[in-house]
Amino acid sequence: MENFTNKQINFDILKERAHNLRWAEVPDGVIPLTAADHDFPCAPEVVEALTDYIKDGYFPYIENRGMERFKEDLAKSFRERKNEPVEAKYVLPIDSAARGMQVIADAFLQPGDECLVFDPVDFLFRTSMSNAGATIKLFPSNLKEDHISLEGLENYITPKTKMIGFCNPHNPMGMLYTKEDLDYLLTLSEKYGFYIMNDEIWSDMIYPEAHFNSLLEFGPERNKRTLTVYGFSKTFGVAGLRIGCVYATNQENYDKLVEASMVDSTIGGINLLSQVAGIACLEKGFYRVDQFVQQITENRDYALQRIAAMPGIKCHKPQATFVIFPDITETGMDPVELVELLKTKYKLAIVPGGERFFGPGSEGHVRICLATSHEVLEEGLNRLEACLKDLMSAK
């Protein structure tokens, strides 16, 4: 698409500012298809909103629990775009989805509690729950053709199970869940009394042929123990502004989130300018989100076509997110070793599977980010193909 080509990417700025395994942290000449972040600038309306607010020079204390307009906009977007009956009074703005996960864990977990975490899944589930003193048990993510199955989940629940981490859409697999499986998860929560940490940070990044189903569509009565986290980094490309929120379905759980967040004491909380940017994103930025989904759809389809013709690698078709999760077991290489080889010899950086980022269930895989131009992605895949051809021809 015209708005998402190399012409729109300022590589000099990325080399200076884009950290977390990206352009500012790799040697010159290396292409980073690593952390799930955009290579493109955010919507111009966000820049205009920040510039307009800053020019007056006033940055006073604001509402401890977030700007009312921001909370209303969040609830409205959840209702309109995801069919979630969210009330603004139960939405707590927070400084990033990652921080929101920690707030949920701190609010509802005690040392000695057990938590079920899918394997593989983003490491922040394990990190936030462990930080709160909980013990982690892993549930193997069962990838079906068109969804991740929850079959057998009940067998992993014990009397100590206090919380389940639920990534919807799933990172790194990029897959969704059926309504039947969501109903099953809520039924288990009602039966055993555990909480659900419901991560929906990827819920706007849905490919055109797929449909996102949310736990919250079943209504607040079914979601009494569901705590949802949302962030702006994937949807709007503003990771450095650290904009997110957590939301509950009742006053009791909301109050616990507020207490754990420490916003009323002003120790915690989201800053003023992040909320100004967040309002602009929600009120004026979704057109760009929809355009961006078209871009990543083209990138996904191109990447899968290229990978299908490469030796030693295969990849399922994701329904959501802007990452792909290829299987590289045929190469016979450990993912960490392959990623190091790619970076040092072929000048391509990607994310290895394994314990560090996604859990032991991600062994034999790598993750590749698609949130860039076709030109950058094409060259990155050229380098991946060259590496794999060299490896497989030497076997």
Which residues are covered by each model-predicted region?
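Extracellular beta-strand ligand-recognition surfaces/modules
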Residues: 1
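PLP-dependent class I/II
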Residues: 4, 9, 25-31, 36-53, ...
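Disordered, acidic Ser/Thr/Pro-rich linker "stalks" and the adjacent N-terminal cap
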Residues: 11-13
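Short beta-strand-loop-alpha-helix junction that forms the active-site gateway
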Residues: 15-18, 372
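Glycine-rich loop-to-alpha-helix module at the N-terminal edge of alpha/beta enzyme cores
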Residues: 57-59, 73-76
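Short, surface-exposed loop/turn segments at secondary-structure junctions
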Residues: 60-62, 290
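Phosphate-binding beta-alpha-beta segment of Rossmann-like dinucleotide-binding domains, i.e.
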Residues: 79-81
